[in-house]
């Protein structure tokens, strides 16, 4: 049995064509079903639906053989015990620093001000600001980052930005790009050794589908 870990939403939707290229189709819609283990048209493949932040953990410990996870999640996780053979080029966005429209970010940096930053990407943010020689206080939140600067909790946010619409709606502006984000295929290293004959065709089909879309 091959187990593939996925999260609901955009990643699942954009992974569906890749699964189809490998001859795999979910028999139930995760948005409509309460089931967390979904059968597929192949008796030897099942999908498990987990939180996006948990995908690397399920794969790392062998509860899943394969998974699809964003670079943002993998960077925070650290990627221990995971083989990352392929950038799937899906669920693309950017990790950005954003502030209120009236906040002088560049001036604050020049003055050496100690900024307060809200984010759920604490590890990535810490490494980014340290590389710039900036002193910041990081405050971890799990959602609604945009609210932080508006109510005085923080001077800036570090978050994922797709179109920038949410920032504009909350009178925020992006001032710095940290990294491009896309989703990656991750593989349990032990599974790759023990189940290579089963996993390699799936990995190859994903790679061919990604190449065809570029």
Swiss-Prot record:
PROSITE patterns: ATP_P_PHORIBOSYLTR (PS01316). GO terms for biological process: L-histidine biosynthetic process. Its main location: cytoplasm. It catalyses: 1-(5-phospho-beta-D-ribosyl)-ATP + diphosphate = 5-phospho-alpha-D-ribose 1-diphosphate + ATP. Its EC number is 2.4.2.17. It is found in: Cytoplasm. GO terms for cellular component: cytoplasm. Keywords: Amino-acid biosynthesis, ATP-binding, Cytoplasm, Glycosyltransferase, Histidine biosynthesis, Nucleotide-binding, Transferase. CDD domains: PBP2_HisGs. Pathway: Amino-acid biosynthesis; L-histidine biosynthesis; L-histidine from 5-phospho-alpha-D-ribose 1-diphosphate: step 1/9. Lacks the C-terminal regulatory region which is replaced by HisZ. Belongs to the ATP phosphoribosyltransferase family. Short subfamily. Catalyzes the condensation of ATP and 5-phosphoribose 1-diphosphate to form N'-(5'-phosphoribosyl)-ATP (PR-ATP). Has a crucial role in the pathway because the rate of histidine biosynthesis seems to be controlled primarily by regulation of HisG enzymatic activity. Heteromultimer composed of HisG and HisZ subunits. This is ATP phosphoribosyltransferase. It comes from Methylobacillus flagellatus (strain ATCC 51484 / DSM 6875 / VKM B-1610 / KT). The gene is hisG.
């Amino acid at each position: 049995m091959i187990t593939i870990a996925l999260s609901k939403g955009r990643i699942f939707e954009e992974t569906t064509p890749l699964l189809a290229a490998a001859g795999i189709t979910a028999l139930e819609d995760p948005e409509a079903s309460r089931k967390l283990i979904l059968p597929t048209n192949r008796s030897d493949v099942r999908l498990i639906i987990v939180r996006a932040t948990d995908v690397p953990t399920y794969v790392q410990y062998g509860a899943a053989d394969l998974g699809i996870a964003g670079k943002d999640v993998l960077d925070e996780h650290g990627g221990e015990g995971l083989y990352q053979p392929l950038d799937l080029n899906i669920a693309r966005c950017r990790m950005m620093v954003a502030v209120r429209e009236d906040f002088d970010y560049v001036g604050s940096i020049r003055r050496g001000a100690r900024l307060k930053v809200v984010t759920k990407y604490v590890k990535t943010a810490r490494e980014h600001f340290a590389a710039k020689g900036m002193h910041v206080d990081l405050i971890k939140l799990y959602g609604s980052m945009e609210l932080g600067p508006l109510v005085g909790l923080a001077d800036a946010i570090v978050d994922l930005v797709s179109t920038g619409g949410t920032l504009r709606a909350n009178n925020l502006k992006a001032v710095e790009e940290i990294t491009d984000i896309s989703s990656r295929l991750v593989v349990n290293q032990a599974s790759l050794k023990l189940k290579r004959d089963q996993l390699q065709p799936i990995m190859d089909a994903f790679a061919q589908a990604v190449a065809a879309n570029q």
